[in-house]
């Protein structure tokens, strides 16, 4: 029987870089100008889902470091998960609106650390304003691909999702 915390599995999702020989040069694993150097750096990026109560790995996604996408790996892990209700716990790099919706629609929960609200690439930046201190708050927005004057005038109601941002839940 799987150990649960208040009815949930606790699954930590994180990634690690696995260096390989720089003699291996391909478009998926090799970076040039890594660490301010012109030397090639070849590696894989290992994304894992680890059960904190069972102390076992639940899933892995292996990506070439040059094309790694932690958010894509997180979505793959959530899509493949078929166990009891879970709380997915992850660090920065795994956050996105798409991931939040995906986890919620599968009746799971998430605890994902996000970039600072002042960061240009923070997923939360457009949901503010926020206090300049620690805070917990519920944020509710209607997601849309439209950019009407009504939508632009009410950022407290609507969140525009650009077409170049992955979002699996719009029809069309």
Which residues does each PLM region occupy?
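Single, function-defining residue in the core of a domain
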Residues: 1-9, 13-27, 35-172
